[in-house]
From Swiss-Prot:
It comes from Arabidopsis thaliana. Disulfide bonds: none annotated. GO terms for molecular function: peptidyl-prolyl cis-trans isomerase activity. This is Peptidyl-prolyl cis-trans isomerase CYP18-1. Its EC number is 5.2.1.8.
Amino acid sequence: MSVTLHTNLGDIKCEIFCDEVPKSAENFLALCASGYYDGTIFHRNIKGFMIQGGDPKGTGKGGTSIWGKKFNDEIRDSLKHNARGMLSMANSGPNTNGSQFFITYAKQPHLNGLYTIFGKVIHGFEVLDIMEKTQTGPGDRPLAEIRLNRVTIHANPLAG
């Protein structure tokens, strides 16, 4: 399964790991399908580290899962933050996943075992490059808005 994140800076296509982390994948895909993420901003951007979004309030303090509460981590030894473009659930501690997610800009091995990886970027790395270069202000908030306009879900990861 794959999705395309249609941002105001361009499109990013991600493979979603439905078999490896079924609960996280179900949550993300259902939120995408419902339009939950449409029009949300990426509220935190740290060059060389990651970009974070998925909070409908745009503050980094909001968002919930499809179950209306936090859900447990799905940490897998086979999934590592070992490359640019890893897609993970953001959390405020163990088993506190909701709707927020982040995409890594580089390897981040110190995150392994702490955040559920549920996908990876497969196309649109040039858009990640643009995002990473966006200037930020207090709280690592982008000075120029980076918006997730909408999400397209693809049943076949190789589909256009």
